[in-house]
Amino acid sequence: MILYLFLDESGNFDFSPTGTRYLVLTGLVTRDVMPAVVALHRFKHEVITQGENLEYFHATEDRQWVRDGVFGIIGACDHLAVHTVIIEKARLDPALYDTRRFYPFACRHLFADTFAHEHPTSFDRVIVFMDNIPVRRVRRATLKGIKENLKGYLAPSQHYDILMHASKSHPYLQIVDYLSWAVYVKWTRAERRPWNNIAHLIRTEHEVFEDSERRYY
């Protein structure tokens, strides 16, 4: 049996008052990647027949009525488990601004929450998917951060893969994009409607610096 983990982030890496307040890292866990695929494909073609040149779903760019349809499909799923960490950037130690240090830090928190609920050693294989990262330095740092933290939860001989694929190539990368965006707009804009559609799927929603008062800017 395979455990699938799809990752997505929301927010930017501008660690200054002009950047986004939060960075959100979200993990979608499932054992079955077939449910919702047909429904999303069918809905995509319904959108196209309405005159939209839609190649794939992307929450920040899709029209509201398209988002409503996608959230309806995701919300009807009962095989998904969502784990998410929220990092208020002003409270993050500047030593962690570099992506080579940030990703291990963020993954450590996300995986601690995720694997407190899931038990990866009971699976034959763990496959992690995330969207392509075009910048080589950031891509390498991300892969290293995932690998370093993931291996601590696996048996020594257990198989795992970490794959970076374009989100347009995999429906579940588009689903986790929507999930992460829903959490992000809840925290940044107090916009709860998207989050309300998927709240029943969320197992953990962890604000990393909830108990910290220190700010760096």
Region annotations inferred by a language model:
Residues 1-217:
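Phosphate-ester processing/binding pockets and catalytic centers
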